[in-house]
Regions:
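Periplasmic/extracellular loop-to-transmembrane helix junction in inner-membrane transport proteins
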Residues: 26-72
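Transmembrane-helix boundary motif in ABC transporter permease subunits
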Residues: 69-99
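Generic hydrophobic transmembrane alpha-helix motif, especially the helices
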Residues: 100-135, 142-143
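Transmembrane alpha-helices
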Residues: 126-130, 162-196, 224, 240
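Glycine-rich helix-loop "coupling/hinge" segments at transmembrane-helix boundaries
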Residues: 116, 144, 192-229, 252-253
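N-terminal signal-anchor transmembrane alpha helix
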Residues: 3-30
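C-terminal transmembrane helix and the adjacent membrane-cytosol boundary/short C-terminal tail
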Residues: 89, 180, 224-253
Length: 253
């Protein structure tokens, strides 16, 4: 274990201990202090109870399919739009105010507006895609625009096929930007998707479980579902980035 990992572990243990002490202090002061702040032990116990049920995994899968589906949809669309914007200056100008608006408007506003157009079942997919689109588009566009023009001119003069140009010139330049955008987008899509589910309350979603726990003051459940969302987000990010790195390695990038 290196020093950096060791420091992170101690930091996590410190905050878990602080959380446990705060929960115990509230329980000592108030008759029902656990309603205000569940202890880490209670949350872990409740998470274990939930994790052995089929309903828990159905709920996780329900949300994961829609949120990650929105991420994939936005990623494909953003890459295509970035390529077109790099090729056509007028299209880049056309996209600029739209991307700026999506970045500036609060996600809650988009969620409420989207509920006018969509049913709650598809809300998290749409909102996740909407939040992922700007960072992937902008990073992809920057990567393409920073491609060495001398290499492109040389490829044009020697009539290098498009496939070889993509692999030998564009991909090595764009992939670092793409990887950064993917890492950022995966975090954004889960935050936005969970917010959409909490507001839209689609049946069978993790957002609905969070809202129900809040209504009935089931604080341990509230923390357990929050931990689940964070854990699933981290797992998806690690797996997807590992896949990207593997593909880059196979392509010799």
């Amino acid at each position: 274990m290196d020093r950096k990992t060791d420091l992170r572990l101690w930091a996590v243990l410190f905050w878990l201990a602080a959380w446990q002490i705060a929960a115990m202090a509230l329980a000592a002061v108030y008759p029902h202090g656990e309603l205000l702040l569940a202890s880490p032990a209670d949350v872990l116990l409740r998470l274990g109870q939930l994790a052995v049920t089929a309903a828990f995994w159905r709920t996780v899968a329900w949300s994961a399919v829609r949120i990650f589906g929105g991420f994939l949809l936005a990623t494909v669309l953003a890459v295509a739009l970035a390529a077109l914007a790099a090729w056509k200056q007028w299209f880049r100008g056309l996209m600029a105010p739209l991307v700026a608006a999506v970045k500036a408007v609060p996600v809650a506003s988009f969620i409420i507006l989207a509920l006018v157009w969509l049913n709650s079942q598809s809300l998290s997919l749409f909102i996740s895609a909407l939040m992922v689109l700007p960072p992937v588009y902008l990073n992809g566009l920057e990567g393409i625009c920073r491609t060495d023009r001398r290499l492109l001119e040389m490829a044009r003069v020697f009539r290098v096929p498009l496939g070889r140009r993509l692999r030998g010139i564009y991909l090595p330049q764009v992939m670092p930007y793409f990887r950064t955008a993917v890492s950022l987008g995966l975090g954004l899509c889960w935050k936005a998707g969970a917010a959409a589910e909490i507001i839209g309350l689609p049946a069978g979603s993790m957002g609905e479980r969070l809202y129900t726990a809040k209504v009935y003051f089931q604080t341990a459940d509230l923390f357990a579902w929050t931990v689940t969302i964070v854990a699933v987000s981290v797992v998806f990010e690690r797996l997807f980035l590992a896949l990207v790195d593997r593909l880059m390695g196979k392509a010799g990038l």
